[in-house]
C-alpha cells in the first residue's frame, strides 16, 4: 500500500484529507502543497467515482468521509449534495482523471512547493 505520511499521525492525516477533499468539492479549486495535492488527488477520484455510481450505498460511503459543510448558502446545498448533483454528472462520460495540478512557485515562509489543484 503506497501513500504519503505528510508528517502526521493516521488520524491527523485522515482529518487533513477530509478537510481538503471537502474544500475542493465546495470551491472546485484550492491552493496547497504539492505532496498534499498528490495525495488528495486519489481521494477525490474515489469520491467522484462514488458520486457517479449514485446509489444509496455510495452516498453513505461518501457521507462517511466528506464533512457536513454548506457549499451554497443561497440554496442550502451541502458538500455531499453538490458532489452527487453537480460534480458527478459532469464527469459521467469520463473514466478518471477528474483533477488537474498546476505548479506555482515555492511558499515564501519555508520554500515548500505550492500547487493549485482543481477539478477539470
Curated annotation (Swiss-Prot):
Superkingdom: Bacteria
GO molecular function, one term: structural constituent of ribosome
Entry GO CC: cytosolic large ribosomal subunit
InterPro entries referenced in this protein's UniProt entry, alphabetically: Ribosomal_bL17, Ribosomal_bL17_CS, Ribosomal_bL17_sf
Keywords: Ribonucleoprotein, Ribosomal protein
Keyword Chloroplast on entry: no
Pfam families: Ribosomal_L17 (PF01196)
GO biological process, one term: translation
Keyword hit for Nuclease: no
NCBIfam families named in the record: L17 (TIGR00059)
Membership in a protein family: Belongs to the bacterial ribosomal protein bL17 family.
Self-association and partners: Part of the 50S ribosomal subunit. Contacts protein L32.
Entry protein name: Large ribosomal subunit protein bL17
